[in-house]
Regions:
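Residue-level detector of conserved, well-ordered beta-strand and adjacent loop positions
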Residues: 34, 79, 259
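Rieske [2Fe-2S] iron-sulfur-binding domain
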Residues: 38-144, 150-151, 155
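Short Pro/Gly-enriched beta-strand edge/turn motifs at strand-loop
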Residues: 27-36, 109-115, 237-242
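C-terminal catalytic domain of Rieske-type non-heme iron oxygenases
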Residues: 58, 63, 69, 132-133, ...
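N-terminal short leaders/motifs
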Residues: 1-14, 82-95, 127-133, 198-223
Length: 356
């Protein structure tokens, strides 16, 4: 793995690469779109994922479902975005009154006897996306060619399955914008070379001495395992497409992801989960403060890297503690190759877009 080089800096900028990331690379994977606590049976939730308006529904007695948030008649959204689910029996288009159940089936269209052509309700259901629950999150896939969720979360299921399936209570969350390409933030969170240096009083105290670092890899996941000062294992997973999971020995989970926003900006989303009644509000607040402290330390670093990754920059040689970066970058190279484009071709597109 160490005979690889880092991705060229040109892949971290330019609209051509940004569009490929959100419209092609992203379609190879499942995406967590809401904590399960944000949607209950009999509710709907409007969200936006990668600039695409979506509608989550949970028909009573069934599993959650996901649809494009647009009426098949003229494309108007059924609902505007909201933080949590809202009770709903039927979805009614505000434009022409087409009415759907939570399964996405058309129940009625206003004055449907007056359409010029024969009108069949069954032909006008909502456009559905694959949707399922795994761990404390609701997931969707934009394409039927996406990796299976079992493959995407393989190491999580095998190494932290108990915590993953029991820490279902969302305690705290945070969302902020970073002035860097998402790949820079993702690389940084996979970078075990910098923790002892950049986070001596924060994350380093959780992960412990570098000599105790143990790495594991599956085809699509990587894992840093360290002994926690309080006993047990502290696990840090790197997951496609741009996600990270931290697991404490007591079963707490921190889910972190870097969502592409623009070529030079991404959105950092953090969710903290634990079992029911695992901690009081003050303890949860303190946990969030601790997480945001080390993430603020990283913010300064990744935004500086974005400035450094100008078109004449070539990244230096990888260190053995940067193997997790190389692992995911290898997967990214494969996706570029499967699209029929070499690294050099994509780099040229990115540079051309930057100069145009």
């Amino acid at each position: 793995m160490l005979n690889q080089t880092f991705l060229p800096a040109s892949l971290y900028r330019g609209d051509a690469m940004h569009q490929w990331d959100i419209h092609t690379y992203a379609n190879h994977y499942w995406h967590p779109v809401a904590p399960i606590s944000h949607l209950q049976p009999g509710e709907v939730l409007a969200i936006t994922m990668l600039d695409q308006p979506l509608l989550l529904t949970w028909p009573t007695g069934e599993h959650p479902r996901a649809f494009r948030n647009r009426c098949p008649h003229r494309g108007v959204a059924f609902r505007q975005g909201g933080g949590t689910g809202q009770s709903c029996r039927r979805l009614v288009c505000p434009y022409h009154g087409w009415t759907y159940n939570l399964r996405g089936e058309l129940l009625a269209a206003a004055r449907e006897a007056d359409f010029e052509q024969d009108f069949d309700r069954q032909g006008w259901g909502l456009q559905e996306l694959a949707c399922r629950i795994d761990g404390p999150l609701i997931w969707i896939a934009f394409s039927d060619q996406a990796l299976t969720l079992e493959e995407q979360l393989q190491l999580v299921h095998t190494e932290a399955g108990a915590a993953w399936n029991t820490a279902s209570t969302l305690l705290r969350q945070s969302r902020s914008s970073l002035a860097c390409n998402w790949k820079i933030a993702h690389d940084n969170t996979l970078d075990d070379y910098h923790v002892a240096i950049a986070h001596p009083t924060t994350l380093h105290r959780e992960q412990g001495p570098v000599r105790d670092y143990r790495h594991r890899f599956s085809q699509h996941n990587n894992l840093l395992e360290t002994p926690h000062p309080d006993g047990g294992r502290f696990l840090t997973f790197g997951l496609p497409p741009w996600s990270h999971l931290l697991v404490w020995p007591d079963g707490r989970l921190a889910w972190l992801e870097f969502m592409p926003e623009r070529p030079d900006r991404c959105t950092m989303q953090l969710h903290l989960f634990a079992g029911s009644d695992a901690m009081d509000a003050a303890t949860a607040d303190a946990w969030l403060r601790d997480m945001l402290t080390f993430l603020d330390e990283d913010k300064a670093l990744v935004e500086s890297v974005q400035q450094g990754y100008q078109e004449d920059f070539q990244p230096g040689p990888p260190h053995q503690l940067e193997r997790r970066i190389l692992h995911w970058q290898g997967l990214y190279r494969e996706r570029l190759g499967s699209a029929g484009n070499s690294i050099e071709e994509r780099s040229h597109e990115a540079i051309s877009a930057l100069r145009s």
